[in-house]
């Protein structure tokens, strides 16, 4: 199928499909070009079948479209000389179609999927860094972007469309990648975007409140994440046993690797396991001692906080389960670097320590504050806000958490989008017992500046919510803004 022929592509579903050479595959009629395959899916916001005439006018070689019903599944028509093949449940089949089109890229590298509410980005980055230190050519796909390590290109979504995912993976294979760590979002799982991928391993970090504007409740959110293990080729399963949901899943996955730093593992009950036996936190990270089915060891980590110890242990267990030698992993562990915008520490002589993190859920904010407290000799400041046009229920929860775990809470804008910024702030303040003690400042840059300039040398300022992002969405505008750049400028250092 090197020439990407329509007949070969559709062989499993439509044996009598016509022969047509295909150049590229796209869901977007606006970029469809001569020789392309246009796939007209019915999406949440638009029906791609409406754009078939536009695609034909632009010279596409063939079209695959959503069938009206089961009776028309496999039907072949011709419009202006262009074959149009109708398939039912096209969204569900799209990952498999794209996989065949791009020559099954997940067969040609070690692909690790990481799902969970928090920790996906750090865990994928650690997996990619560590495997590369052991000789792989490693890549990442997720929130920060897609690409080989050091050459990551920013993306809009954690998990792209089913076609985008297979296309990106194929590009990575073409660049020589032998290992890829991919963030797998709940949206991506529900919408079948990774349905046909063959994961060598699948990692579950944790589950807490997020995306309830989409899933409705925690039960449906958990069910979405569980799809990675119940409906996908998940390979080795690595599960965080410190998470309540993780413990439930371990009971259903007897062959999974259980990982804990809170003594939630009984070695006599789990087939394979890894647990921290002692963790000592210090200014530059933590010293971690652990025992496991593969042996015991000690790691010096440059990452801040308990949840990053958990992320590191999950990455370690995954690589051990995939067959990388423990001795080699221990030799290279000290070379692992913190991830951009994930508990990223900025320091300067005579200035407070500033930590920039992506925490934008109640659980993530609590863990980030607890992590920062471990390294704080003075007062702990928290600068944060909540996104507009998103789950409003988490706003008072995050206000309560900031009030409880920080000494000084500075409430500001995040990405207000089309909501009134002050209304979002008021929702946050409603969760505080004494909102009068919070500092309120709508302009995010001004709020960060206020906190950093007023904090003392022994204080720690956590700037939470945006992490690696270099933009702010106000109304329908995407404005240039970066917490990292703002903090670096205030401290006189390089971001």
Curated annotation (Swiss-Prot):
Optimum pH is about 8. GO terms for molecular function: ATP binding; magnesium ion binding; UDP-N-acetylmuramoylalanyl-D-glutamate-2,6-diaminopimelate ligase activity. Its EC number is 6.3.2.13. GO terms for biological process: cell division; cell wall organization; peptidoglycan biosynthetic process; regulation of cell shape. The keyword Cell wall biogenesis/degradation applies. A motif (Meso-diaminopimelate recognition motif) lies at residues 414-417. Pfam families: Mur_ligase, Mur_ligase_C, Mur_ligase_M. SUPFAM superfamilies: MurD-like peptide ligases, catalytic domain (SSF53623), MurD-like peptide ligases, peptide-binding domain (SSF53244), MurE/MurF N-terminal domain (SSF63418). UDP-N-acetyl-alpha-D-muramoyl-L-alanyl-D-glutamate binds at residues 27, 29, 44-46, 157-159, 185, 191, 193. GO terms for cellular component: cytosol. The modification N6-carboxylysine is found at residue 225. It comes from the Bacteria. It is found in: Cytoplasm. Meso-2,6-diaminopimelate binds at residues 390, 414-417, 465, 469. This is UDP-N-acetylmuramoyl-L-alanyl-D-glutamate--2,6-diaminopimelate ligase. It comes from Escherichia coli (strain K12). The lineage of its organism: Bacteria, Pseudomonadati, Pseudomonadota, Gammaproteobacteria, Enterobacterales.
């Amino acid at each position: 199928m090197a020439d990407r022929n329509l007949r070969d592509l559709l062989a499993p579903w439509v044996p009598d499909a016509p022969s047509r050479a295909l150049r590229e595959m796209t869901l977007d009629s606006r970029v469809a070009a001569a020789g392309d395959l246009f796939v007209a899916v019915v999406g949440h916001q638009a029906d791609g079948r409406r754009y078939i005439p536009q695609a034909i006018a632009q010279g596409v070689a063939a079209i695959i479209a959503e069938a009206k019903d089961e009776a028309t599944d496999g039907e072949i028509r011709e419009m202006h000389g262009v074959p149009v093949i109708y398939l039912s449940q096209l969204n569900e089949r799209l990952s498999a179609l794209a996989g065949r089109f791009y020559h099954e890229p997940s067969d040609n590298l070690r692909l690790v999927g990481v799902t969970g509410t928090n920790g996906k980005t750090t865990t994928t980055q650690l997996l990619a860094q560590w495997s590369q230190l052991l000789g792989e050519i490693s890549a990442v796909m997720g929130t920060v972007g897609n690409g080989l390590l050091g050459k990551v290109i920013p993306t809009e979504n954690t998990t792209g469309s089913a076609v985008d995912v297979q296309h990106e993976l194929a590009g990575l294979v073409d660049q020589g990648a032998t290992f890829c760590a991919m963030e797998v979002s709940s949206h991506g799982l529900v919408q079948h975007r990774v349905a046909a991928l063959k994961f060598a391993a699948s990692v579950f970090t944790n589950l807490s409140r997020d995306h309830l504007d989409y899933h409705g409740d925690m039960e449906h959110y958990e069910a979405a994440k569980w799809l990675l293990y119940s409906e996908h080729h998940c390979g080795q399963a690595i599960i965080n046993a410190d998470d309540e949901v993780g413990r439930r899943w371990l009971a259903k996955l007897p062959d999974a690797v259980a990982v804990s730093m809170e003594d939630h593992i009984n070695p006599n009950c789990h087939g394979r396991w890894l647990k921290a036996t002692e963790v000592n936190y210090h200014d530059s990270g933590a010293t971690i001692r652990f025992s496991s089915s593969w042996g015991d060891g000690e790691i010096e980590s440059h990452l801040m906080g308990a949840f990053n110890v958990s992320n590191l242990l999950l990455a370690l267990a995954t690589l051990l389960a995939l067959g990388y030698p423990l001795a080699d992993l221990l030799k290279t562990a000290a070379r692992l670097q913190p991830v951009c915008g994930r508990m990223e520490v900025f320091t300067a002589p005579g200035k407070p320590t500033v930590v920039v993190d992506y925490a934008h859920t109640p659980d993530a904010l609590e863990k980030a504050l607890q992590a920062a407290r471990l390294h704080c000799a003075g007062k702990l400041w928290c600068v944060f806000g909540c996104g507009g046009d998103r789950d409003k229920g988490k706003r008072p929860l995050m206000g309560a958490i900031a009030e409880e775990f920080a000494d000084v809470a500075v409430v500001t804008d995040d990405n207000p989008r089309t909501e009134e910024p002050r209304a979002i702030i008021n929702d946050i303040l409603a969760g505080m017992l004494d909102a009068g003690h919070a500092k309120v400042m709508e302009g995010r840059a001004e709020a960060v500046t206020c906190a950093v300039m007023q904090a003392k040398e022994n204080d720690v300022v956590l700037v939470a919510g945006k992490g690696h992002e270099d933009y702010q969405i106000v109304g329908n505008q995407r404005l240039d803004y970066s917490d990292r750049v703002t903090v670096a400028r205030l401290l006189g250092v390089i971001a």
